Each structure stands twice: as structure tokens, then as C-alpha cells.
Amino acid sequence: MIYQSPTIQVELLEDNIARLCFNAEGSVNKFDRETLNSLNDALDALAQTQGVKGLMLTSGKDAFIVGADITEFLGLFAQDDNVLQGWLEDANKVFNKLEDLPFPTISAIKGFALGGGCETILATDLRIADTSARIGLPETKLGIIPGFGGTVRLPRVIGADNALEWITTGKDQRPEAALKVGAIDAVVAPELLETAACQMLQDAISEKIDWQARRQRKLSPLTLPKLEAMMSFATAKGMVFKVAGKHYPAPMAVVEVIEKAALSERAEALQVEHQAFIKLAKTDVAKALIGIFLNDQLVKGKAKKAAKQAQAVNSAAVLGAGIMGGGIAYQSASKGTPIVMKDINQAALDLGLNEAAKLLTAQINRGRSTPAKMAGVLNNITATLDYNALKQADVVVEAVVEHPKVKATVLAEVEQVVGEDAIITSNTSTISINLLAKSLQKPERFCGMHFFNPVHKMPLVEVIRGEHSSEETVASVVAYAAKMGKTPIVVNDCPGFFVNRVLFPYFAGFSGLLEDGADFAAIDKVMEKQFGWPMGPAYLLDVVGLDTGHHAQAVMAEGFPDRMAKEGKDAIDVMFEADRFGQKNGKGFYQYSVDRRGKPKKEVDPLSYELLGNAFGEQKEFSSDEIIARTMIPMIIETVRCLEEGIIATPAEADMGLVYGLGFPPFRGGVFRYLDTLGVANFVALADQYAHLGGLYQVTDKMRELAATNGSYYPA
């Protein structure tokens, strides 16, 4: 044994090839300080070992290295620039040391080699992967750029254009795609990986492969003609800005760094990378995006914990077919849980099956599935008109029409059919879980399971705990949602649950602006372009359906009359009463036609302005700041109320619910991250300026206490 630590072991194999194995004590290899220090020591030990002719890097885990330990590095990001600069320089000395070894090196890659893992393999001369490998630099998704030489080495290995695409998108690449552009040198079956790596290394040792020329290319400036370089980077800037926009600076920084370092050798190019990394690490966007990553880990960790106390879900059922039922059936079946789809109407069953088939066909067209896989998924969906087909279901999802009496009747009927241990859930968006539980003999085996439309696209599922729901029931439904590929958050029962409860105060703020003469299209523009929502409130209401919004608004007003009850008609009432329901009937705030691809196309409709003008009088202009304040303050305060009342357990889960359920701008991190960025005291002062607008603008006593102590919702 040449070297051994808790994270790395180095041994000398036959033919004087050294094998360096990353093998941390946890379930995966990450680049933390301990691993980085161990790698440095291991390389020193190798340099002092006589007779070593080559080095193979490998992993003792299913994945090579999944990336940096973000939790550890967050503390570094808060340090002074010179401290961060020193850390980057020290870390990069280790990767340079690997790259400068006096013999050829190869990485044998299985599973994920992401972030720092990808930067490690780029520092070796050769790279071979098995069929399970996934390679990439996802740092831009966290609001930063690679910091261990990724922007320097990757362009010199695969060319500037390919590197720009890899790094700016942050997507991980399959081995076939990596081989095509030259990021790796071969792909082999998993059982052949290390044997093939040793053989390739032998070819380098015997100079059949010119490893020194490969290495020199990574140390030198990019070989791009000047005119071609100018055109390439100019085009990249335009394309990246179009996709990333002004709110996400990291992808554009990647283009600028690679361009600036193109004519430099390694040392100078790394300095360019370091400076950009430090600048981005200090931004609110990086804090927000890293926060989302950590919150996502927390929510997934809770789901894994729930799975340990959950009963197994080997078969499921959905009551009510159609688009929603078909979407739920598709999601369950495609993730391996067979499902029965029950309806009282054959036409609805056909619609549900067609929805599943349509989604599967789209996967085939994108190259993400095959006809054989499609057949397998469809075989996992059983359509039926007969309740008896549900007898074996471990979990039933009720997804019939949003009417309390209909749901109560269906739930009572299904309880008579399913097994003693079956769990029944309701996919309701507005009806109290405690109310529906009254129709059941075993309310402890019942909870809410609120999917968002369209089911296949929206990652969130709200699991609603009723007052009688058992912990095993909730845990089992959380585990089933996670098995379906969804992100489940547990919320306690209340009108609107969590997501809709905080959404409707936002709509109320929007309606208040319209009553005061604001232009809904101007509001949408501000909320989309400046605040960062994927859709402004008028457009979102049209997509949700103004009839649906009208009904949900009434539920919220009944549940929270002190602040959500209305005086007189608002804009939603005006549209609803004019039979303008949004996209579903081609007219809402906007009017809709169908484009060439069959998608709804939004256009301004003078009639909607006429209706609003008749109801509320002349239009007035409002500043962007006022539009943002009047729409966002009610949502933010209601989100805080949900935390204070225990409707949602943590700021992290609230923020994930908002990002995944509503499309809250990720670069702002969610309501609680946004509050911490603004400063709670600053927000309270802002809200107080609008307190005269009513109960939705009144901050809570606890918020005032937090503001007085300069507190925050996340640890500083």
C-alpha cells in the first residue's frame, strides 16, 4: 500500500501501475477538504515511490465522485475574497500536481463524475468510462462556475463550442455523447472497466498513445483562429443570454471566462477562472440557488426517512380518469408501480389512456424511451369500470370532480372494496381533508395527495395530513410520491393547504391593483421580466382557469374571512361573470388562438379592457416597485403565517413548495430566502407602507420580533 486515508487508498498493481481509489466512508464520494487534502498527500506519496509507470484513478462506490461538498464550501463563500482566493489556489495546486505527474494517468469512470469529479478526470491524460457513467459540470445550476479548472481544461479537451454548451447548461452527459466530442477515450461494459483502463494505460506507457501531447494541449492556449474565436464567443453570448436571461449571471460568466482565458496558458487561465468564481460566489443568486439545492436534499432526505416507516406500495389505483387521472396513471406506471384507473364512464377511461399514450409517444419522439418501454408502461395501467378491480391496491388516489358530496360518496364506496390495510388519498385542491375523512370508517388511513397540473411536468406533490391521518399513512404516501419521481412536502390541513393558500393572496394583490386602475398586461410584464415569475398573475389565472380561480377564491374567503373576504366584485368576478374562463374557452384576461404547433397563443383582447374599465374606471400607471410590493407582500406574509401556524414544518419545505409548485423564481430562492436577502426589518417597513390596504398586508407579531433582533429564517 502506497498510501491510505479514510477517503483514498493507493496501491501498486502489476506492471508498476498505481491504483488510486476514492472510497469515502459515506454512501458516495464527495470533494470535501478532507478528500482534497488526502488527494494531495496521496500524490506526494506517489511522487516519492520508485518505479511507478502509470496511475489509474477509480472509485470504490457506484459513482466516481458526485461533486463538491456544498455544505462545507458555503462557509468559505462567506469569507473575504483573499481567503476564497487562497483556498482556490491551494485546491488547484492539487489538480495541477495530478496533471503534472511524470508518468501517464487515466481515470476509470463509473456512475456520476460531476463538478469536482469531472474536473478530476479532466486533469488526467486519458479517460475511460463504463456504460453507467454520467459526466458534467453542473455548477451554473448553483449560480457559480467550476472552480477546479473546469473552464480551463474542458475547452482544451473538447473544443470551445462543446465546452460552452456543457458548462453553460450544466447538464450531465451520457458516455456516448462524451465519447463523440472526445471528453472520454472509450466506453466499455462495467465489468471490463479497470481491465480496459489498465490496458489503455499500458498503451500510453509504451508510447502507442501520445499522452504527453494530450497533456500539453491542456496546458497551452486554445488553438482557435482569431476570427473564428470572435464569432464563436459572440454567438455563444447571444444564445446564452436568450436562455439564461439577466437574472442568472453564471452561464454568461462562463462564456466570458473561456473567451478571456483562450489565449492564456494554464496558470493565467486558472486565475481568470478564480476571479469569476469569487465574484459569483458572493451573489444573492448563488446563495438562492445553492439554498434550493440544499433544501431539495433536505426534502428528499425526509422522503427517504419516511420510506423506512412506510408500508410497501406494490400496486395503486386512481379513481377518475380523464387528463388528471391519466397523468397520475402514467406517472405511477412509468416509475414501476402498476395502477388501476377506474371511472364510471368509458369515454373518460379512453381519454385517460390516450393521455398516458400521448405522454409516452412524446418520450419516444425525444429519444428518451422506446416502443418496447412504452408497451411495458401501458401494460402497467389497467382501465376499468368495475370497483372490484381495486381490491389489491395498496394506495388509492381519488381524483374525481372537485365537489365535496361527490368525493365523499366515492371515498365511502371505495373503502368498502379495498383491503383492510389499503391507504386512500384524495387529490383535492380546495376541499378540507378533515371534512372528507368524515365519510370514512378508517380516517387514520386517509390523507390528501395533491398533484399539480400537468402531472408529468410539475415536480411537487402536497401530502396533506388530516387530524386523524396516522404517521404510517402519511409516510407511505410520501414514499409513494417519491417513488413516482415527485418531490413530496407534508402540510397540515387548512383551506387551500399550503400552495393555494399562499397563491390566492397574491391574486388578491393583483386584483386590488386592477381595481385601482392598473393594466393587467403591464403587471404581467413586471412580474415576469423583473421579478422573474414564469407567468404574470393575469396569464397564470387564464392558464389555471378563471372558473377554477373563482371557486377557489370563494373557498379561501370562507376559510379566512378576516383578510380574504372581498367587498364587492373583483377582476376575477368580472371575467367569470362574462364567461371568460381563460385558455380553456379561448378568452380570459387575454384571448387565445392556436398556433401552428397546436399550442395556445396569447393575444391582447380589447374586450377584457372594456369590461375592467366599466367595472373599475380609468387606467392609471403604477411603478414596477409598487406592482411588485402590492402583489408579493400578501403572498410573503401568508407564507410566514403558514410556518407560524405549523401548516408547513420548515422554511426549506415552504420554499421548495413555492419553487416546485408555483414556479417562484429560483434565483430568489423562495419566500424565506427572499425575506432573508431583503432583510426582515426592511420587509416589515415596506409592508407597513401598504398596511392601509387591509388584512393581507398586516405583518405578524413574530415577524416584528424577528425584525427587531435582525433575525433571519435560515441560519446565517
Curated annotation (Swiss-Prot):
It comes from the Bacteria. Residues 1-189 are annotated as: Enoyl-CoA hydratase/isomerase. It catalyses: a (3S)-3-hydroxyacyl-CoA + NAD(+) = a 3-oxoacyl-CoA + NADH + H(+); a (3S)-3-hydroxyacyl-CoA = a (2E)-enoyl-CoA + H2O; a 4-saturated-(3S)-3-hydroxyacyl-CoA = a (3E)-enoyl-CoA + H2O; (3S)-3-hydroxybutanoyl-CoA = (3R)-3-hydroxybutanoyl-CoA. This is Fatty acid oxidation complex subunit alpha. It comes from Shewanella loihica (strain ATCC BAA-1088 / PV-4). One of its GO terms (biological process) is fatty acid beta-oxidation. Residues 311-716 are annotated as: 3-hydroxyacyl-CoA dehydrogenase. GO terms for molecular function: 3-hydroxybutyryl-CoA epimerase activity; delta(3)-delta(2)-enoyl-CoA isomerase activity; enoyl-CoA hydratase activity; long-chain-3-hydroxyacyl-CoA dehydrogenase activity; NAD+ binding. Pathway: Lipid metabolism; fatty acid beta-oxidation. Keywords: Fatty acid metabolism, Isomerase, Lipid degradation, Lipid metabolism, Lyase, Multifunctional enzyme, NAD, Oxidoreductase. Pfam families: 3HCDH, 3HCDH_N, ECH_1. One of its GO terms (cellular component) is fatty acid beta-oxidation multienzyme complex. Involved in the aerobic and anaerobic degradation of long-chain fatty acids via beta-oxidation cycle. Catalyzes the formation of 3-oxoacyl-CoA from enoyl-CoA via L-3-hydroxyacyl-CoA. It can also use D-3-hydroxyacyl-CoA and cis-3-enoyl-CoA as substrate. InterPro entries: 3-OHacyl-CoA_DH_CS, 3-OHacyl-CoA_DH_NAD-bd, 3HC_DH_C, 6-PGluconate_DH-like_C_sf, ClpP/crotonase-like_dom_sf, Enoyl-CoA_hydra/iso, FA_oxidation_alpha_subunit, FadB. The gene is fadB. Substrate binds at residues 296, 500, 660. Heterotetramer of two alpha chains (FadB) and two beta chains (FadA). In the N-terminal section; belongs to the enoyl-CoA hydratase/isomerase family. In the C-terminal section; belongs to the 3-hydroxyacyl-CoA dehydrogenase family. Its EC number is 4.2.1.17, 5.1.2.3, 5.3.3.8, 1.1.1.35. NAD(+) binds at residues 324, 343, 400-402, 407, 429, 453. The record marks 119, 139 as: Important for catalytic activity. PANTHER family: TRIFUNCTIONAL ENZYME SUBUNIT ALPHA, TRIFUNCTIONAL ENZYME SUBUNIT ALPHA, MITOCHONDRIAL.
